[in-house]
């Protein structure tokens, strides 16, 4: 199974066998991610980092992943200090960076930007989030977290929060459909999962339930995946204010959950998870954040042909 020169744009491109291969590779590389051993697997390779939106975990974990494997990182830095501020197109920027890097990780505010970039790129494009579209590398780390901390086959999971604009949820739904998951969607009506995604999931014969209140699902799920309300994607601030405080995960709520329930969150969080949850056995989101390093190590090594 070869991933060499493969663009990582959407989870729709991956079979279960391909996903499992990435997860297995990440598990093999995890000791390197923890700094227990060193690696020169990507020595002499350069990762181009183009972020048109803010990021902490995705950007730093990609850069850490590249450096843990002995490679180098070439970062765009501030968009305002680049030729993009002069009107350079994304296509031209990608063509230019092709001459400098062996792969490009791209985050952009416009849905479809990663696909567009891949059409002009001679090196692999790794989509680190395209507007409200997809975030496949986050999904890989989410699946890895679930496998390490719970189980994938026959999983019962609740996805709660902003399901309309939350790109991590969009990608995760597609992947979970390959594992026969039972998915409960928890959100206000204004933030429902887009109809086209729901229709697609139902066509895959996945068990899907939509509810408005997490209290109606908390007792029965293995994993609770929480997302923040994506304030920056609301065209109308008044609409954001209507739903801003629609979800709160508290220790009191979790008393009703299974003892083995894991609470996940792609972060950053705002006020949807009470900080007191951090000290419970259910909190899994900081482990989840770390798992981004071995997963992105695996993806980088695979698309650059250092591993098969």
Swiss-Prot record:
Record organism: Methanococcoides burtonii (strain DSM 6242 / NBRC 107633 / OCM 468 / ACE-M)
Matching PANTHER family: ASPARTATE CARBAMOYLTRANSFERASE (PTHR45753:SF6), ORNITHINE CARBAMOYLTRANSFERASE, MITOCHONDRIAL (PTHR45753)
Gene3D superfamilies registered for this protein in UniProt: Aspartate/ornithine carbamoyltransferase
GO MF term (any one): amino acid binding
Amino acids binding carbamoyl phosphate: 57-58, 107, 135, 138, 267-268
Protein name in UniProt: Aspartate carbamoyltransferase catalytic subunit
Catalytic activity: carbamoyl phosphate + L-aspartate = N-carbamoyl-L-aspartate + phosphate + H(+)
Phylogenetic placement of the source organism: Archaea, Methanobacteriati, Methanobacteriota, Stenosarchaea group, Methanomicrobia
Subunit structure: Heterooligomer of catalytic and regulatory chains.
Pathway assignment: Pyrimidine metabolism; UMP biosynthesis via de novo pathway; (S)-dihydroorotate from bicarbonate: step 2/3
Family statement drawn from the similarity comment of this UniProt entry: Belongs to the aspartate/ornithine carbamoyltransferase superfamily. ATCase family.
Biological-process GO terms, alphabetical: 'de novo' pyrimidine nucleobase biosynthetic process; 'de novo' UMP biosynthetic process; amino acid metabolic process
Group of enzyme by EC: transferase
InterPro entries attached to this UniProt entry: Asp/Orn_carbamoyltranf_P-bd, Asp/Orn_carbamoylTrfase, Asp/Orn_carbamoylTrfase_sf, Asp_carbamoyltransf, Asp_carbamoyltransf_Asp/Orn-bd
Residue positions binding L-aspartate: 86, 167, 228
Matching NCBIfam families: asp_carb_tr (TIGR00670), PRK00856.1 (NF002032)
